[in-house]
Amino acid sequence: FKWRKGTISDLGTVVGGSTPSKSKPEYYTEHGIAWITPKDLSVNKSKFIAHGENDITELGLKNSSASIMPEGTVLFSSRAPIGYIAIAAGEVTTNQGFKSVVPKSEIGTPFVYYFLKNALPTIEGMASGSTFKEVSGSTMKDVPALIPDSETLAKFNEFCGPLFGQQQMLERQNQSLAALRDSLLPKLMS
């Protein structure tokens, strides 16, 4: 097995986020484009996330520097606090409190997810700022990474991929059951 030295940029594309103007209510909606904030991850008890507290509209997306990231993107909060991690369960955008990683297809989401979880102390150590620590996009891209050979990576993804899929399905079922419980419980009490 031959591993090589690299950086997060070798694992995927680092993408920042943006906040559409809060003074423009037409930029926000309930059922629009998923827009995730670190606060959303602070209350997310799952490995996967599909929506946050607010969604944005096409107009909000167009009038900000937010970009849509694909399902499987590993969301990483880069400030306030550093290190909340979740996997996009569908297409999402984020606010500027993220430096997310869109995994290269040959690397895969599971490897990037576990890499970021394990690299958190290193990433925190690279953060800068006097009042609040923050990880910049260029710093995130330069975080050192050991990258396994393609055979090892393929075996890892072959093992983890189905587990991640099953976990995502179970998390969705739990959320559906919780919503059903929450709608039925008041009816039972009345």
Residue ranges: model-predicted function:
Residues 1-19, 142, 146, 150-190:
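Non-catalytic DNA-recognition/assembly elements of restriction-modification systems
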Residues 4-148:
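DNA target-recognition domains and sequence-specific DNA-contacting regions of bacterial/archaeal
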